[in-house]
């Protein structure tokens, strides 16, 4: 193998290694930023991964909201009318958060089956519900009042 060919080979191998490293970094960054949506039924059935950031959504069960008297800790239960999953959250809930209405919580599922949320999103008017929640409710055979998703 002559020296010029050897030089080209090393250059091509170096470029391929650089591209592979760049693709690896890009995939790693994308994987960390993906938040997949899971219904309470999927979470209860063990389909949601533990200690990975997920979005859990459904209707807040009536009578399930428990506020701590001395901190901002809140605990409530979200249901898709098939199964339910408890959610804990530390912070101020959105003004539109109410029992019996649709929410999406972003957080991690722990080993006890509780979603530890770091963000809670509530629907923004009476007729809107997140598309994922609407789909989950339709699949469970329930229909929420005024739950048509609008862009």
From Swiss-Prot:
GO biological process: cytochrome complex assembly
TM segment ranges: 9-29
Regions of this protein lying in the Periplasmic compartment: 30-151
Binding site for heme: 124, 128
GO cellular component, one term: plasma membrane
Pfam families named among the record's database cross-references: CcmE (PF03100)
Protein topology in the membrane: Single-pass type II membrane protein
Keywords from the UniProt entry: Cell inner membrane, Cell membrane, Cytochrome c-type biogenesis, Heme, Iron, Membrane, Metal-binding, Signal-anchor, Transmembrane, Transmembrane helix
Ranges in the topological domain labelled Cytoplasmic: 1-8
Molecular functions (GO terms): heme binding; metal ion binding
Lineage top rank: taxon: Bacteria
Cellular localization per UniProt: Cell inner membrane
Gene3D superfamilies assigned: Nucleic acid-binding proteins (2.40.50.140)
Function: Heme chaperone required for the biogenesis of c-type cytochromes. Transiently binds heme delivered by CcmC and transfers the heme to apo-cytochromes in a process facilitated by CcmF and CcmH.
NCBIfam families: PRK13254.1-1, PRK13254.1-3, PRK13254.1-5
PANTHER family: CYTOCHROME C-TYPE BIOGENESIS PROTEIN CCME HOMOLOG, MITOCHONDRIAL
Entry's family note: Belongs to the CcmE/CycJ family.
Protein name: Cytochrome c-type biogenesis protein CcmE
UniProt organism field: Pseudomonas putida (strain W619)
């Amino acid at each position: 193998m002559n020296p010029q060919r050897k030089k080209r080979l090393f250059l091509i191998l170096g470029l391929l290694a650089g591209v592979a490293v760049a693709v690896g970094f890009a995939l790693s960054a994308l994987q960390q930023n993906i938040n997949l949506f899971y219904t309470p039924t999927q979470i209860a059935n063990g389909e949601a991964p533990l200690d990975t950031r997920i979005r859990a959504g459904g209707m807040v069960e009536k009578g399930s909201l428990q506020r701590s008297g001395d901190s901002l800790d809140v605990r409530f239960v979200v249901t898709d009318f098939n199964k339910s999953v408890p959610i804990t959250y530390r912070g101020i809930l959105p003004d539109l958060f109410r029992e019996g209405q649709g929410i999406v919580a972003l957080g991690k599922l722990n080993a006890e089956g509780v979603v530890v949320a770091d963000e809670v999103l509530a629907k923004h008017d009476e007729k809107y519900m997140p598309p994922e929640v609407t789909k989950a409710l339709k699949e469970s055979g329930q229909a929420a009042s005024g739950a048509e998703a609008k862009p």
